[in-house]
């Protein structure tokens, strides 16, 4: 049939990524055979070709669940969040289920998240996981929102039972490498194939066909049941919609071929009643068939020898009763298919004797046939969930900024899983949050060497190189990423970091803005833009960028930190304290945020609280020199020079090449009237190439130390 041919060609082109050709053929298909199924197929072609606007226009107004899901997805791609939500939830009372199952709830969760409705989005992501425990993206979103439950709970026994139930419902056969859905579809393909060959029936059968299609034989509401079949999310077959008028149950019901009928019942007897109820049962099967995918039935015809035996070359259905004795024995073929259950083998207290004997023989010959399959199923589910538990633990800890716990979780993985790109990226990010830039560099470098085509996380890698001041490596990385994908926001973030390291903030800002053009929801790019505006002392623009980042992700603590630094530089200390507090609520283990929060407290004359915050920062990360330096600064301002000297002497051992440490020691020795040591440390500070502004200040201090001695010498003369 023309419709079948075009539909198969469209699917083949989609599988081979020939999207434009698929669109062309699907437009022909829809013009010749207008139906909701073909409309959905064309929408998929448009979406595959990044033409969400085209899918939006052709699906607008569709009411079937699958069309609503595709329309909502198109709206989401076009940033029409209100229309997307309305398509997924047409009723305010939520009486109608969200189309798409787990995917529909996940999409609705994203819509709620980007609309600023955090609690609703959390609910939808949890619903997605309840529908499909393997919907990892939903768990990842929950981690990002800070609302994820422990992985052992999410991927525990309930998830295992859910997956087992789903697999049983889908009739997965692990041992034979094919699903029982395909076997069932091949049985139903028998009826479709028989119908499609009615043109080859001899003349007398043509007359019988007219008699068979008389209105008196049509069951009530048959058309209505087939045309409004509930629209399960599987795509119905357009072939079935075309041959509705032929009414396949009636064709088989009225055939006067006893031998053939017996053979047919030997195939479908596991779910067919006796002759009196044959039409009703087949009508129900036709209704069920309308919810199945066309591609699955076609695959079943190709793979299953049963369905192949009833093609155009197999005309044995039309033989006389005597000739039909030489037809292939279908009852002998039934052993190749799985028997569903003894309940389906009998109906209304009766069973076909031939079927019953074949089922009994099958059960006797293979009494524990399902045991290996069930064991394989349970074993496979257990392995998958065990892996997801480890990954989930690490991911959850990382988003809670418990980086040490995250690293310990990832170390439980096998070597194969640990060396995957995603895990190496997570490990690198964990070290990055710990400010262990050398280990972070090692992890990111390994990931980039093994997977040079993967760009996810490269923005963080470029920031690591920025902090390590690896200008040459950062420039090489930026060029490499741009050559791989110029349309990736991560690539342009790397370029921007390269220019920022060179103090070319204007060019860096343009690079980060280019990343935002490619992905408006790329939170880190907005934050980096804010940093560059702050470096240019354009604080209003910096604040605007940080606000945009927080509009996308309220748990992006870097933006809260950036706002705090902006207010701190503007001497708005109360506002700065509030922003640092919000940042600490998200990342309570950041010694950098604690340090600057302490500075804001100190500037507000809350010195005791400031000292406590500095000590907490030192305990959190003893390797970070910043809290120790500012602790000494606060002690110096309070006149406690000896404690400040002790802190700086310890810090000097950790950071001997830091000019600011020696300059601070020079000031303290000056206050303690140990002028020789003060001059020594000021000289060391100048030798370590401080910034021009710091160099001017250090020279001014040295002049104050030398000038009194000169005056004393002149007076003696």
Swiss-Prot record:
Pathway membership, UniProt: Protein modification; protein ubiquitination
Reported phenotype of the disruption mutant: No visible phenotype. Cdc27a and cdc27b double mutant is gametophytic lethal.
Gene name of the record: CDC27A
Positions of region (Disordered): 198-217, 282-315, 342-374
Protein name per UniProt: Cell division cycle protein 27 homolog A
InterPro entries per record: TPR-like_helical_dom_sf (IPR011990), TPR_2 (IPR013105), TPR_rpt (IPR019734)
Annotated source species: Arabidopsis thaliana
SUBUNIT field: The APC/C is composed of at least 10 subunits. Interacts with APC2 and APC10.
Compositionally biased tracts (Polar residues): 198-208, 342-356
Protein family (similarity comment): Belongs to the APC3/CDC27 family.
Primary subcellular site in the record, as a coarse category: nucleus
Keyword Repeat carried by entry: yes
Keywords: Cell cycle, Cell division, Mitosis, Nucleus, Repeat, TPR repeat, Ubl conjugation pathway
């Amino acid at each position: 049939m023309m419709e079948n041919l075009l539909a198969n060609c469209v699917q083949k082109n989609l599988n081979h990524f020939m999207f434009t050709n698929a669109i062309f053929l699907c437009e022909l298909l829809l013009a010749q055979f207008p139906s909701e199924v073909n409309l959905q197929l064309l929408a998929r072609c448009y979406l595959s070709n990044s033409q969400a606007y085209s899918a939006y226009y052709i699906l607008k107004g569709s009411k079937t669940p699958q069309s609503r899901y595709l329309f909502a997805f198109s709206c989401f791609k076009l940033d029409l969040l209100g229309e997307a939500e309305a398509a997924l939830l047409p009723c305010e009372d939520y009486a109608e289920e969200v189309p798409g199952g787990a995917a529909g709830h996940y999409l609705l969760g994203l819509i709620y998240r980007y609309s600023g409705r955090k609690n609703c989005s959390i609910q939808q992501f949890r619903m997605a996981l309840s529908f499909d425990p393997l919907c990892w993206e939903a768990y990842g979103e929950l981690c990002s929102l800070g609302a994820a439950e422990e992985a052992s709970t999410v991927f525990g026994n309930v998830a295992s039972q859910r997956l087992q139930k789903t697999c049983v419902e889908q009739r997965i056969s692990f041992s034979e490498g094919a699903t029982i859905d395909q076997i069932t579809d091949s049985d139903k393909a028998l009826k479709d194939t028989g119908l499609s060959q009615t043109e080859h029936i001899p003349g007398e059968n043509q007359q019988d066909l007219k008699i068979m299609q008389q209105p008196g034989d049509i069951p009530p509401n048959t058309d209505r049941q087939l045309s409004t079949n509930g629209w399960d999310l599987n795509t119905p077959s357009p072939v079935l919609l075309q041959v509705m008028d032929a009414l396949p149950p009636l064709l088989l019901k009225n055939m006067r071929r006893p031998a053939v009928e017996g053979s047919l019942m030997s195939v479908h007897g596991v779910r067919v009643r006796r002759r009196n109820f044959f039409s009703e049962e087949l009508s129900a099967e036709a209704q069920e068939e309308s919810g199945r995918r066309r591609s699955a039935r076609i695959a079943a015809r190709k793979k299953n020898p049963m369905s192949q035996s009833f093609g155009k070359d197999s005309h044995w259905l039309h033989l006389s009763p005597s000739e039909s004795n030489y037809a292939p024995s279908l009852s002998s073929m039934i052993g190749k298919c799985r028997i569903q259950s003894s309940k389906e083998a009998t109906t209304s207290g009766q069973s076909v004797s031939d079927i019953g004997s074949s089922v009994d023989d099958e059960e006797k010959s293979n009494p524990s046939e399902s045991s290996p399959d069930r064991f394989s199923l349970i074993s496979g589910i257990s392995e998958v969930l065990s892996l997801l538990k480890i990954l989930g633990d690490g991911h959850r800890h990382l988003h809670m900024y418990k980086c040490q716990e995250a690293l310990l979780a990832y170390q439980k993985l096998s070597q194969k899983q640990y060396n995957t790109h995603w895990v190496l990226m997570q490990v690198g990010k964990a070290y990055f949050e710990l400010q262990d830039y050398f280990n972070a560099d090692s992890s990111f470098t390994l990931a980039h060497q093994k997977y040079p085509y993967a760009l996810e996380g490269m923005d963080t890698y470029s920031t690591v190189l920025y902090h390590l001041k690896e200008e040459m490596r950062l420039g090489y990385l930026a060029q490499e990423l741009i050559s791989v994908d110029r349309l990736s926001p991560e690539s342009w973030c790397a370029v921007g970091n390269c220019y920022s390291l060179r103090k070319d903030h204007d060019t860096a800002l343009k690079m980060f803005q280019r990343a935002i053009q490619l992905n408006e929801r790329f939170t880190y790019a907005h934050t980096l833009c804010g940093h560059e505006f702050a470096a240019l002392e354009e604080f209003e623009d910096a604040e605007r960028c940080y606000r945009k980042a927080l509009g996308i992700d309220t748990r992006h603590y870097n933006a809260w930190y950036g706002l705090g630094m902006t207010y701190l530089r503007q001497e708005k200390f109360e506002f700065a304290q509030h922003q640092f507090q919000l940042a600490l609520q998200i990342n309570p283990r950041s010694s950098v945020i604690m340090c600057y929060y302490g500075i804001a407290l100190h500037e507000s004359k809350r010195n005791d609280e400031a000292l406590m915050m500095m000590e907490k920062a030192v305990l959190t990360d003893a390797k970070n020199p910043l809290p120790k330096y500012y602790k000494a600064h606060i002690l110096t301002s309070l006149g406690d020079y000896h404690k400040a000297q002790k802190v700086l002497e310890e810090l000097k051992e950790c950071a001997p090449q830091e000019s600011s440490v020696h300059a601070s020691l020079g000031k303290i020795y000056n206050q303690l009237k140990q002028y020789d040591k003060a001059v020594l440390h000021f000289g060391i500070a100048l030798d370590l190439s401080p910034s021009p502004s710091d160099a001017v200040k250090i020279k001014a201090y040295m002049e104050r130390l030398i000038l009194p001695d000169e005056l004393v010498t002149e007076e003696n003369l």
